[in-house]
């Protein structure tokens, strides 16, 4: 049996990151976690490009455009959606998740889902580097692994 898996060495990888500006006090921490993790795994600073978009709903569009350029080994998406009093949360979360999945399958470039979806601001803050780790850092590790896995299929 052959086992195919990506390693966690970022040397030589080019990574795109799409970040939603809405709830920027949280998404900026997710971005910092992602950038720090990429650098610690060997990705060069000049091989990381960041595109800011208005919010989570716009992330799939930019992620797909970024992936379509074929300049990136992986694209990380970072955003935060916090439930409010209306159904807006459900629509944004569902459509963003679908769009991000489609961006990866349509382009053949790994697109990593890093949208934090929570019931409260406190839960979002926890996932941006306090009690529950940093989702941006987790996504960076996934991006490196998937980029290297994808290369093994070429």
From Swiss-Prot:
InterPro entries: LS, LS/RS, LS/RS_sf. The active site is at residue 88. It is an enzyme of class 2 (transferase). Pathway: Cofactor biosynthesis; riboflavin biosynthesis; riboflavin from 2-hydroxy-3-oxobutyl phosphate and 5-amino-6-(D-ribitylamino)uracil: step 1/2. (2S)-2-hydroxy-3-oxobutyl phosphate binds at residues 85-86, 127. Its EC number is 2.5.1.78. It comes from the Bacteria. GO terms for molecular function: 6,7-dimethyl-8-ribityllumazine synthase activity. Gene3D superfamilies: Lumazine/riboflavin synthase. Keywords: Riboflavin biosynthesis, Transferase. Coiled coil: none annotated. GO terms for cellular component: cytosol; riboflavin synthase complex. Forms an icosahedral capsid composed of 60 subunits, arranged as a dodecamer of pentamers. Belongs to the DMRL synthase family. PANTHER family: 6,7-DIMETHYL-8-RIBITYLLUMAZINE SYNTHASE, 6,7-DIMETHYL-8-RIBITYLLUMAZINE SYNTHASE DMRL SYNTHASE LUMAZINE SYNTHASE. Catalyzes the formation of 6,7-dimethyl-8-ribityllumazine by condensation of 5-amino-6-(D-ribitylamino)uracil with 3,4-dihydroxy-2-butanone 4-phosphate. This is the penultimate step in the biosynthesis of riboflavin. This is 6,7-dimethyl-8-ribityllumazine synthase. It comes from Bacillus velezensis (strain DSM 23117 / BGSC 10A6 / LMG 26770 / FZB42) (Bacillus amyloliquefaciens subsp. plantarum).
């Amino acid at each position: 049996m052959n086992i195919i898996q990506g390693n966690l060495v970022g040397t030589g990888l080019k990574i795109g990151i799409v970040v939603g500006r809405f709830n920027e006090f949280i998404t900026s921490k997710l971005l910092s976690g992602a950038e720090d993790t990429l650098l610690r795994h060997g990705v060069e600073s000049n091989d990381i490009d960041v595109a800011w978009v208005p919010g989570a709903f716009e992330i799939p569009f930019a992620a797909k455009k970024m992936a379509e350029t074929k300049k990136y080994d992986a694209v990380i998406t970072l955003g935060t959606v916090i439930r409010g009093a209306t159904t807006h949360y459900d629509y944004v979360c569902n459509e963003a998740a679908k769009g991000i999945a489609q961006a990866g399958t349509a382009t053949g470039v790994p697109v990593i889902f890093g949208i934090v979806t929570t019931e409260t601001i406190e839960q979002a803050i926890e996932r941006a580097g306090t009690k529950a780790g940093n989702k941006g850092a987790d996504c960076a590790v996934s991006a490196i692994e998937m980029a290297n896995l994808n290369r093994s299929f070429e």
